[in-house]
Amino acid sequence: KDDLVKGFEALNTGKWKYAFSVTDFEYSIFRSFKEIPSGGVEMFFSEYFKKRSQDLPIALHDAAQFYWGKPDAWLSSLKMFERHSYPVIIPRWRVQDIDTEDDWKRAELLFTTQMLTN
C-alpha cells in the first residue's frame, strides 16, 4: 500500500508523467555477457571489464506491480521509461518476474520465507 501511495503522491506533484514500481538488478548488468555462435562468450559492456561491480552504476528494471500515469501521457503513448517518470523503488525480495518454471520455484521460496518471517 505504501508503494502505491508514494507513486500516486509523486504523480500528483505535477512534476512526473508516470510513476511505477522498479527494483534493482541483483548483479551489475555492466559485467554481463552473452554466448556467441562460436560457443565462446562476449561482454555486452567490455569497457567495464576492469571495474569493480560496486563501482558501477546501479541499474533498475520494471517491477510490473503498478503503473500510475497522467491521462495525457497514456493517450499520447508517451514512453514510460524516460526522464519524466518517477521510479518507486521496491526491494528485490518483493519482486519476481515469472516466465519459467525456475521463476515459479523462486517465487514460491520467496513467499514461504516471507510467511515464516512475518
Regions found by a protein language model. Give the residues of each.
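Conserved core of the sugar-phosphate nucleotidyltransferase
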Residues: K1-H84
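Conserved alpha/beta core of the MobA/IspD/sugar-nucleotide pyrophosphorylase nucleotidyltransferase superfamily
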Residues: I58-N118
